[in-house]
Amino acid sequence: LSADEKKILKKMLVERVAGRVPLLMGCGGNNTAAVVKDLKEGDWSGIDGILSVCPYYNKSSEEGLYQHFKAIAEASPVPVVLYNVPGRTGVNMSAETTLRLARDFENIVAVKEASGNMTQLEDVIKNKPRDFDVLSGDDGITYPLITMGAVGVISVIGNALPAEFSRMVRMALNGDYEHARIIHHKFSDLFKLLFVDGNQAAVTAMLHAMGMIENQLRLPLVPTRLTTMEKISSILKELDIRY
């Protein structure tokens, strides 16, 4: 999205959500000074928090990651959710650094964890401050993470199947693990397909198969391969999911 498109989208979302649920907005990058400038000069009205990804490409040290998020926490007018996704950034933020940030800054309130490292995730969940939340950043491990103590997910598949996937999350959070597990297994093949050609392309293909949108993306993203599209359509048909 261009800067102007982001402003339009933000305005639309603030109006549509109308305070019914907390609204997170992405604000991150690998140029700390630029992120801090955006936080200080941007319009954050109607936004309840920011989701800030680990700096990508630079491959910062653990101390570099700490200092990056320290600067963001000190500049942000709203709460900060850390985002650890080494598969996209090229760097993993350790449990130690995540916990250090959680303890040192009251406005760092959560982490979206997509490392897939269950030992690391357990370390964070076990040792975190009481008022710091762990959110899954990977749909496929959301159910097991909630059983370990995570409190939710920032989802990909939820863009296409919000009702059913959020039902699974609510069931798990309420301790109804048996029925939550049924939904988890029901979607297991879709979870895997999300990564075959990239999850942006996959969720777009899902919405297209449901008759909701055109199967179009902006470069450098392209639609899924035909074989992937056919598998997605077949699974949705088997699950009797349609718009």
Segment roles from a protein language model:
Residues 5-8, 12, 37, 71, ...:
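A non-catalytic, amphipathic alpha-helix used as a structural packing/dimerization or gating element
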Residues 74-75, 88-195:
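Catalytic alpha/beta core domains of metabolic enzymes, predominantly
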Residues 147-149, 188-222:
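Conserved short secondary-structure transition element at the edge of the structured enzyme core
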Residues 1-90, 100:
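Active-site beta->alpha loop and helix N-cap motifs at the rims of alpha/beta catalytic domains
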Residues 84-85, 107-108, 218-219:
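Glycine-rich phosphate-binding "P-loop"
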Residues 212-243:
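Flexible C-terminal active-site loop/helix
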Residues 13, 42, 72, 111, ...:
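Conserved, mostly hydrophobic/aromatic
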